[in-house]
């Protein structure tokens, strides 16, 4: 374990405060609820054929997330320092998902815009997808992280757009999910660990040099 990176902890705290601000403005105020609801309705009306694409896209979210979880397990099994890496991946995956579930059922959504609806902040679907993507990113070797980042970003953006267009969630719900996972990602990455593949660990021992050449 290397030294803690305080700047990432500060950034995580900033995202946490921003998430609280989004909730207070978009859920606890009349103007915020009205604008938030209006944006969701407008997204649906302006989407056109996009709604069908989003519906098909969302159907892929569950299997892709499951595949991502399996990939994390495989990466942990293949790389060194498995305990630390498994702990990091577990916190990165289960932490945001559990927090989103607790927040969704504990936070209040007052009836301010005339629409009696249950609280949906933050989006559990988007939280799950984003958390799995971040876990895969953290468990992947550095040289492959750009590939994970690009494909993961496309998956996250597609999911965020889909849940709003399909009226599963309001824009603030999606933003809250992203801020929540971002907070966890920064906090977890603030405690870096040294990871090497089993092969590299073997070669690092001078006594194994002859064996490695066979």
Label each region the model flagged.
Residues 1-65, 104-113:
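N-terminal transmembrane-helix/juxtamembrane module of multi-pass inner/ER membrane proteins
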Residues 2-5, 75-88, 138-147:
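Membrane-interface helix-boundary motifs at transmembrane edges
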Residues 8-15, 84-92, 147-151, 173-176:
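Alpha-helical transmembrane segments of integral membrane proteins
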Residues 26, 75, 100-108, 137, ...:
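Membrane-water interface at transmembrane helix exits
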Residues 58-80:
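Hydrophobic alpha-helical transmembrane segments
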Residues 72, 94-102, 131, 186:
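Transmembrane alpha-helix boundary/anchor motif
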Residues 87-119:
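Hydrophobic alpha-helical transmembrane segments of integral membrane proteins
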Residues 113-213:
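Membrane-embedded catalytic cores of phosphoryl/pyrophosphoryl-handling enzymes
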């Amino acid at each position: 374990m290397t030294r803690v990176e305080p700047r990432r902890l500060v950034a995580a705290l900033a995202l946490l405060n921003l998430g609280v601000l989004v909730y207070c403005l978009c859920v606890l105020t009349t103007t915020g609820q009205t604008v938030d609801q209006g944006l969701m309705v407008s997204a649906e009306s302006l989407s056109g054929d996009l709604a069908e694409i989003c519906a098909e896209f969302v159907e892929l979210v569950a299997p892709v997330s499951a595949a991502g979880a399996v990939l994390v397990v495989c990466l942990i099994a293949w790389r060194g320092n498995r305990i630390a890496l498994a702990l990091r991946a577990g916190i990165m995956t289960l932490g945001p998902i559990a927090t989103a579930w607790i927040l969704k059922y504990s936070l209040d959504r007052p009836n301010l815009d005339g629409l009696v609806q249950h609280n949906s902040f933050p989006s559990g679907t988007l939280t799950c997808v984003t958390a799995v993507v971040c876990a895969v990113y953290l468990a992947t070797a550095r040289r492959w992280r750009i590939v994970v980042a690009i494909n993961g970003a496309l998956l996250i953006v597609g999911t965020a757009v889909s849940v709003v267009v399909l009226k599963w969630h309001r824009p603030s719900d999606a933003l809250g999910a992203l801020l929540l996972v971002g907070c966890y990602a920064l906090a977890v990455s603030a405690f870096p660990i040294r990871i090497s593949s089993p092969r590299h660990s073997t070669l690092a021992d001078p006594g194994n040099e002859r064996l490695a050449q066979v």
